[in-house]
């Protein structure tokens, strides 16, 4: 049996099916574009889901893919098992061949058997097949094609061998192919008590979609039967490299050996598990970041953070003192960058995110581990860590719950999940949003039906501002209607063609007017559904509008021109950011509005004022050069080869529109643009800020809006000059003088306030109340700065060794509490506790401080009348 590399296995699989007239479909992003209920793509069929359900048509009926997939949870792939078992992974590649109404069971089994035994040269006596127990048809094909006897065809009664999308929809029996690693390895055939052993390993699963589930008890035969298969690349490579553990294949071993050379710890004992975790999680983290996911505390970003922090903890276990993961990235890019060029394109950004996250986590990792050690010292095997401690590790030290569980796993200590969740609910500001699906299946089906009946909307707006179009559908309150009669009714309108641009690619939709006979419709927005249906959001202004009639569609030309200007400027900005900030910059989001543009980029630090000036200068230089803007349609592959920028994770058709601006910018884009860069006029950045870790937001204006901005600033400047009775040449000096004078006045005011609050020892003795052997002095004051109240209270408690000083300052709708306690009595009376209790009494949420000095707030001014009583009760029980 020939030994194949991972790359050769992938290549041979794809080449084999291409030779058998399958279309090679590139992998989709890990972020599913067609299933809002799914967090990540976890199998090869996800990108074809709408094809299988009949909601989408493709120009091919047979396909082959090598699909990036990710599983980071669930009963079959718990994160805690990754690295410790032979075949659990977060990121993996799923090889698959698919038929959409073309071939079925016999041909699928033939393709699989022929590839395994002839192309991959697997011994026939090492292979077994499982079938669903009632699928006699599949059994007959296995006997005919492979020559299997009944002893090699295993009938399975459970749903492991019957697949469905849900309670309704396409479904069908499965047939799995198992490989026998040999009797020297423990394990039994599928369906036996020893089936969980490692001897017999599933290497290929074929789903025969032949039924449609109508309801719980009813299924019918499909008129168009389909095939969905999946072969895990890592599993298959392990078989072909004669190893029984996926982590021993060439791809993982290269990463593990590279890591070993850096950390200088041998790959043996417990360390080998850490090396495997790091190798697996490096792939998952890097591909997620390349597809646009940023570590955060919710949704996909939180899954990424969990994976990253688990790998970082294992790097810590190997003794890595400095960030490690980003140092391993070049090796991964070297191994997989040719097959997945998004890794190469995003390498600098991935490296930056990996390093930053590790630096951020290292700051708290050791302290969190120390707390965990202290809290579990008295726990023994079978005990449970409290949910409160687990939550503190999560909230304060950044330990995801499954990381805490992973650490305690070796000691057989569990975590109180219920207690953890209770703590999570109590701290709402730390709660993460749950991942929710759209819940709009009825509405989704409406749009699929429209697309099925009428097809895509033809967009005319690249060359026309107005056109005669046929109205093919009207929608009101999510229902199709034949006409709209009520004036000022809001509704959706679909036509066979339109000059209106539907919001997509960051560019918002057009507005304008539709005229039909005696009717007039105002278009207040234009949207795009299912990628190709252009939907006009309308208000009826006059007459009646009907399905089937022709109408004149006219866009607001000035509105469109301003959109063109800002969209073209966005392309130029993108190119200049690459030049000024670096090639790692990728687009994370954008908004093209008629009055401004917003552009989100991957960049790990703030853009400096100097860089902003340089960016503005370069963009304006390109505008002044008045480059011609050309658009062409070409194959996606050709466009990318020519250097056209594409968005990671974005789904493109086989043919794309490429927008070229001189030699400056080349991007895939379906938006509307100016004819020459000079049409933009001018460009000005208005703000730059952070919106997430590693993501910066730039906002800018162009053309007439730059002039408007300059006029507003000029008007503001003149108002300031008038108010300060100066001119712009003397303005800075005048402002600095005012600021200096203000500082002096503030200092004088501070001295005055402190003097007014100061008391002699005799005055304290006279004014203070005697309570349980100590003195209590309470004063209500006006809206005085907290800093002054702190200083005044501290000064008084230094003069008298048994004093509790309480100030309550009343501001506009709020109260400020200051409590100071003489240090000689802090063993009995704690300023922090007193301040917090007063705060809660006065409607606040508690404050903070030390035993001798603390401050807090409140807002229930009405309760001040009872403050004396509250103070007395607090001190008599202290």
Swiss-Prot record:
Q: Which domain of life is it from?
A: Bacteria
Which InterPro entries does the record match to this protein? aa-tRNA-synth_II/BPL/LPL (IPR045864), Ala-tRNA-lgiase_IIc (IPR002318), Ala-tRNA-ligase_IIc_anticod-bd (IPR018162), Ala-tRNA-synth_IIc_core (IPR018165), Ala-tRNA-synth_IIc_N (IPR018164), Ala-tRNA_ligase (IPR050058), Ala_tRNA_ligase_euk/bac (IPR023033), DHHA1_dom (IPR003156)
Keyword Zinc tagged? yes
Localization recorded for this chain is: Cytoplasm
Q: Catalysed reaction(s)?
A: tRNA(Ala) + L-alanine + ATP = L-alanyl-tRNA(Ala) + AMP + diphosphate
**Which cofactor is recorded for it?**
Zn(2+)
The enzyme class is ligase
| Keywords assigned by UniProt, alphabetized | Aminoacyl-tRNA synthetase, ATP-binding, Cytoplasm, Ligase, Metal-binding, Nucleotide-binding, Protein biosynthesis, RNA-binding, tRNA-binding, Zinc
Question: What residues bind Zn(2+), as annotated?
Answer: 567, 571, 669, 673
- One Pfam short name: DHHA1
GO molecular function terms listed in the Swiss-Prot or TrEMBL record: alanine-tRNA ligase activity; aminoacyl-tRNA deacylase activity; ATP binding; tRNA binding; zinc ion binding
The record's section on PROSITE patterns has: AA_TRNA_LIGASE_II_ALA
The record describes how the cofactor is bound as: Binds 1 zinc ion per subunit.
For this protein, the record's SUPFAM superfamilies field holds: Class II aaRS and biotin synthetases, Putative anticodon-binding domain of alanyl-tRNA synthetase (AlaRS), ThrRS/AlaRS common domain, Translation proteins
- Look up the record and report any one GO term of the cellular component aspect: cytosol
Matching entries from CDD domains are given as: AlaRS_core (cd00673)
Record EC number:
6.1.1.7
> Which Gene Ontology BP terms does the record give?
alanyl-tRNA aminoacylation; negative regulation of DNA-templated transcription
Q: What is stated as this protein's family in its record?
A: Belongs to the class-II aminoacyl-tRNA synthetase family.
User: What's written under domain?
Assistant: Consists of three domains; the N-terminal catalytic domain, the editing domain and the C-terminal C-Ala domain. The editing domain removes incorrectly charged amino acids, while the C-Ala domain, along with tRNA(Ala), serves as a bridge to cooperatively bring together the editing and aminoacylation centers thus stimulating deacylation of misacylated tRNAs.
What the entry lists under PANTHER family is as follows: ALANINE--TRNA LIGASE, CYTOPLASMIC, ALANYL-TRNA SYNTHETASE
Biological role stated in the UniProt entry: Catalyzes the attachment of alanine to tRNA(Ala) in a two-step reaction: alanine is first activated by ATP to form Ala-AMP and then transferred to the acceptor end of tRNA(Ala). Also edits incorrectly charged Ser-tRNA(Ala) and Gly-tRNA(Ala) via its editing domain.
This chain's protein is named: Alanine--tRNA ligase
- What is the organism field in this record? Rickettsia massiliae (strain Mtu5)
Source taxonomy lineage? Bacteria, Pseudomonadati, Pseudomonadota, Alphaproteobacteria, Rickettsiales
- Which gene underlies this protein? alaS
